[in-house]
Amino acid sequence: MGQAASMCRFRGCRYKNKNKSSKQQQQQQQQQQQQQQQHQQQQQQTPSHSPQIQHHSEIIPATTGLHLRSIEEPATTPLQFQPTGRMNTEQGGTGYGGYGSSEHSLLIATRHAGVPLPLAQHQPLPAHYQPLNHSGAAPPSSSNGSSSSGGGVQTSATPQQQQQYQVQQPYQYQYQHHYHHQANSPQHHRPYDPEHARMEAWLDENQEFVQDYFIRKATRQTVDAWLVSHATSAGNDVVSSTSPTHANGQTSSSRGGSGATTPVRKISAHEFERGGLLKPIVNTIDGTPTFLSIGPPMDNGSVGGSCSNLQNVGGVVAGQYQYNHQQHHHNHAHLHHSQHSHYQAGGAVGSSSLGSTGGASGAGGAPSLGGSGGAGNGHQYPYYHCHQRPQRLSRNELKQLDEKELIFELVKDICNELEVRTLCHKILQNVSILLNADRGSLFLVQGRCNGPDGLKKCLVSKLFDVCPRSTVEEMEQQDEVRVAWGTGIAGHVAESGEPVNIPDAYQDERFNCEIDSLTGYRTKALLCMPIKDSSGDVIGVAQVINKMNGECFSEIDEKVFSSYLQFCGIGLRNAQLYEKSQLEIKRNQVLLDLARMIFEEQSTIEHMVFRILTHMQSLIQCQRVQILLVHEADKGSFSRVFDFEANDLSEEEATSRTSPYESRFPINIGITGHVATTGETVNVPNAYEDDRFDASVDENSCFKHRSILCMAIKNSLGQIIGVIQLINKFNELDFTKNDENFVEAFAIFCGMGIHNTHMYEKAIVAMAKQSVTLEVLSYHASATMDEAHRLRRLRVPSAVHFRLHDFKFDDIHFEDDDTLKACLRMFLDLDFVERFHIDYEVLCRWLLSVKKNYRNVTYHNWRHAFNVAQMMFAILTTTQWWKIFGEIECLALIIGCLCHDLDHRGTNNSFQIKASSPLAQLYSTSTMEHHHFDQCLMILNSPGNQILANLSSDDYCRVIRVLEDAILSTDLAVYFKKRGPFLESVSQPTSYWVAEEPRALLRAMSMTVCDLSAITKPWEIEKRVADLVSSEFFEQGDMEKQELNITPIDIMNREKEDELPMMQVNFIDSICLPIYEAFATLSDKLEPLVEGVRDNRGHWIDLADVVKTKTSQDQEPEEEQQQQNVISNGDCKAMSDDDVAASEAEVAVDSPSEKASVNGSNVANNSSNTNKKIAVASHPTSTQPSDDDNDVDADADDVDEQAAEENGHDAEVDEASCRSNSTCSSSTASSCLSTPPPTGEDDSTPVSPLKTLQAKLVAANLNALQRQTSNQAQTQKQRCKSCDHSRSGLQVRKTSSLRGAQELDLDSKTRNGTHAALCKSTPVINNHSHHHNHSHSHNHNHHHHHHHHSHHNHSQHGIGIGSASIGGSGLISLTTPLLAMDSDRIPKIVGKIGNLDGLPFANGIGGPQNGHGLPFGSYQHHHHHQHHHHLLARRHSETNSNGATAMAVEK
């Protein structure tokens, strides 16, 4: 009791102390026992599961319905107190009341979870104490009878109220719905427990607590049980559609898809849960899935009748119960209606009006006031409770009610009616009762003023001249009466919105007396009022005629009429909205069926169009439907025309015919051509009144065009692909706006269907072409029989002869036939031919076919595949791992090695993806590897190449599976995924690798080891293979630059060629070395592989150090600044402006200038450790040496590598221009050298300040050289103004750092003739004297060294020397930009000095040649001791036309 009291206090109920009396407790226990006994008797007598509840005479059902006082007073009236708020009985609650002391007066028959329980009360409550729910209305009761207490009118909860409660309280409704299912099973029948009922009632009231408790405490089993119990049973009957669906769902590509871009609707399925359990979307009728709903219809005469809402909830109409009520009326001051109800299983269904179960459902019951219900349609739907609507009171009974009670009773009569015609009939009958009128009419507003649909606003008589004795069926036989807007009395009321009360209708000019003449009825008094909705818009007009007593309608009648019509307006608007929603549901179901039908039939265009035509003719109901397809090439004509006529369905072949007729009838080109051209929709009510219609199509034919609806069919791009035309709607009606909307939707689906069918047909054609192409490809990809015969007759040497077991195997001396014979030896030694019964000639042809399908690329060719197979053979035989893998897997591995790069294009997977190649579209991951595998299968399945033909089915499947895994494992991306688990397992014993998963891992790693096996070979082999790989990579990089306009990665960038040694070291450390060390751990016999990798790594490190050393010795920009400071602070200060101008003039190439002879100059070698610096000094203006002792590094200028590579090309291009521009013939120069600047400037451009700086630098070097050579004689400065200059030199090919010493030596011998020894030692410079017409000469000395930079020594006045050559060969020259700063504006400068005639060599090797010079010694460059002998270092000089010497040094 304490718990019950606390719960009652929690819900606001008053708990009486007298409830604690023992007498009442005993009485309660007796009542419970009686109820249990009655329940047991009912179970024994009633075989069905439908519960029967008998009510005690003292039991009063829970109050429900609208109370009159609730209309007049707000819910917050002090005399009203709130109910418990628990779920009402008909909505799944316990029905247990908590008003006053009623708790001990319960007399409950049976405890069923969710079954309505009546409420017992000792004393009836007064009317103003009737409990109200939260909305101000009393909660619905479990019975449908009506009772009054103190004038209160009580009715049952209607299905509409239950549906509204379901929307407002979805959790409670689902709870009730769940227990309705459980209550009908025998295992859930249990006796009533009062304490359990109280707790359940409290939980019903406190849903927030229930949810919170469920979230915190519910177990997984509880949630699963809840989900199972709430699953929709109808969903199990749904048959999946046969229409194909796209695998990736969205974004479809523009290629091959419909192209439709449907936006994602911002709606969630959770939003539909607020309305309770909805009907299933998909149903099954005759084994065919459909979207049309099954079960009793909701929009026919039963709409608004009993069970109309609950029947369709959940899609499966459950069991119903019908209440039969006997009403007893008592003549008290306030009538009290008590009622006795009992359940009757399997009651009638489908009552359409209050008090009649017949109504619109056709059961025969007249919808009279107080009429009894008919038999209904007799359908029984188990599991659902459905309450029959209460019968309407008779007119005599209504007359006994006061005004407010009467209005309230009539409002209840219409508030739950949702069928428009039935509602209008009830409104007119109730209005006649209220106003005591003889008959009435009701008009509804249709159309809009200047609406987009073209319908004008008017009044349509839904019901006309309705009398109290008329029925809905009689009214349906009447024709509609249309009243123009603003015409007549009704039109005036609709337009003005004001009521009209006319005592004598014939006295009003707006009255139309023709109606009376037709009906024979005399209209006298007339009251007409508008019906408005909640927003104040006029939605209808109601009028009543002639009061029964012959009087006129008074102002009181007007007020009563107006008050009642306010409720009628709300009910009428709800009924219209409900009717529209039902029609919208039906339309959506039809469109969904159409979409399903279209997309499940896409085999041919004929089949798809035939289904569209049949569905459209059935829906629109017209005589003929045509679909005309526009010609793709000629948009002004139709390629195909499909006809369908209504009587085609009645022919004998209708069931077997799957395609429509084509071009049976004449085509109306006028209208269809207009639509096909403009895309406009044409709706013609009378074809002969339209100028576009060609009347000749009806000549000589019994068919006549009347109404035409024509619309364009468009694809997703908005292009017109066809026209759909409907002709002659049935019953001589015109095509309406709704028809246009339907045809528009059909046209959209038809366009998608036609597009998809065209794509399907194109796909079929493409597949046929592919089959033919594959057949042709397999024929040409296979080797000929003659080649196989020839290979078959060749003798195959042993594996020892081929050295196939050697890890240092080299195929450099192998011919192609030798590689094929070596492959045959592998198959023979591994016993594949005998074990798998491989035909030897088929094996020969297969090998020839595999070799034929490798492209002639630089590296990934047949030789690479052969070397990979040899390494796999060596590993299998050396380690005896063939015992682990078995013969089948060994066969797959050898085949995989030979085929793992089939049809390789010389590009990797990344390039295929970047280029969006067809291969990348075909395979998303491991693109090339999948292609290699497909090519392998194609060859294996080609006739004459089926080496696996004699394998069993299981062995063949296993070989293919291992083969695919092996080829895909050659992708480094797959290698990185599997390497981690493999490295963790290398310490396992041999027995560990026998299992399937470790064995597959070992196979994958073995493929990678063999694929990269070139890194384990001796250095000569590795070096050769590395050159091939880098060459192929560079080719791909060039393609990425040219075709894709992207910068390749470093390893494929030809500009980063000299960084390849270091990249190769990184490749070994990150990829190769870990896996080979792991394999050496697995088997000691694989240790040579690791040693080979480490040895090659050392060689690559040596090459990388060479590149690094050369790069580190390049002069930094700070040294350039130091040189500039030396020039500005030293000897250059003594230079006069005239000398500077002379220097600048001499710098300009091909321009005559004056030159002065040099008094004297010395050449010496200045060595410091490994860096050798060369300084050449000469004072520009005097013979006195300068005091500045600073030496300037000759290697002060950095040279761009790309410019160095372009140097030779520049010399060739400009050679002709140099020859044409030169005014003097060259003396001993072997070729003419021209070096245009990067900016395209020539040497005739004005002198720039930087050239002045360069001249100063040359003068400083010469001055420094002069101070160091004290033994040199002074010479006179001479100038020449009439000599021209020319350049000569040869190109030097830049070699890669990957080239070996042998190649470089061979290259040097080729270029230098027999004096190749000079390439490895200090070059000897031979002086040659050249005399000209002038007594003075022009001397040029230009030194240049190139590896990653250039070195230039320039002097205006220097030592005169003759033309020099190295080893008697031509001059070697390479010109690059001089300085990095301002390189885009500075031309390439060639230093010019005077002739060094008569200068002896410092080392005594050479002597004076013409009596004018001093000895000039050879020297070693400062890079000589740090570079390997096989790397090239180049110097070049340029001479003038008088015989200036150019010299180059190659190291």
Curated annotation (Swiss-Prot):
Pfam families (alphabetical): GAF (PF01590), PDEase_I (PF00233)
Bias-annotated ranges (Polar residues): 77-91, 235-248, 1268-1277
Keywords on record: cAMP, cGMP, Hydrolase, Metal-binding, Repeat
Catalytic reactions on record: 3',5'-cyclic GMP + H2O = GMP + H(+); 3',5'-cyclic AMP + H2O = AMP + H(+)
Ranges for domain GAF: 419-572, 604-754
Enzyme category, top tier: hydrolase
Protein name: Dual 3',5'-cyclic-AMP and -GMP phosphodiesterase 11
